[in-house]
C-alpha cells in the first residue's frame, strides 16, 4: 500500500486515495500529500489491472483523470490467513477497499471512462491511440 500512496502523491492534491472498511463499518483512510502534477494524465487499464493498480486507478478517476481501456480485475479486499492446529489454514476477508468517492472495487473493478478493447493479434494499439487522442 505504501508504494500505491507514493505514486498517488505524484498525481493528486492532498486527500483520500482510498479507504478500507471492516465488517463493522470501521474505516481507515489512506491519504496523498500535496504533490499534484500539472500535466494532463490519462491512464490505461484492463482486466490485468488488479489490487494496488486498481486502487490508484480509482483514486485518479475520482479526481478527474480519464481512464481508457477495459474494466479492471476487481480485487479489492484485504485477507488474513489463520493457521489451524491440523496444519491447514483458513483465509478470511477482513476489509474491503473503496475509491475516494465510495465506489467498491471488489468483484466490480474500476470502469474506464472510455471503454476500448484491444483484441489479441492486432498490431494497432487502440487503447493507446484513444489515450493519445485525449491530449
Residue ranges and their predicted role:
Residues 1-51, 73-83, 95-98:
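Gly/Ser/Thr-rich loop/hinge elements
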Residues 65-75:
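Gly/Pro- and small hydrophobic-enriched strand-loop and loop-to-helix capping segments
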Residues 1-8, 41, 53-57, 61, ...:
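Extracytoplasmic/secreted envelope proteins and their assembly/folding machinery
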Amino acid at each position: 500500500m505504501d508504494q500505491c500512496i507514493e505514486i498517488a502523491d505524484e498525481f493528486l492534491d492532498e486527500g483520500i486515495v482510498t479507504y478500507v472498511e471492516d465488517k463493522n463499518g470501521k474505516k481507515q483512510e489512506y491519504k496523498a500529500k500535496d504533490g499534484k502534477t500539472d500535466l494532463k494524465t490519462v491512464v490505461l487499464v484492463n482486466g490485468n489491472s488488479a489490487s494496488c493498480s486498481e486502487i490508484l486507478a480509482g483514486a485518479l478517476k475520482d479526481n478527474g483523470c480519464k481512464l481508457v481501456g477495459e474494466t479492471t480485475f476487481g480485487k479489492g479486499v484485504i485477507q488474513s490467513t489463520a493457521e489451524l492446529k491440523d496444519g491447514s489454514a483458513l483465509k478470511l476477508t477482513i476489509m474491503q477497499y473503496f475509491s475516494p468517492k465510495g465506489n467498491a472495487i471488489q468483484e466490480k473493478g474500476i470502469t474506464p471512462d472510455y471503454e476500448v478493447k484491444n483484441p489479441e493479434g492486432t498490431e494497432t494499439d487502440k487503447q493507446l491511440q484513444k489515450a493519445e487522442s485525449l491530449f
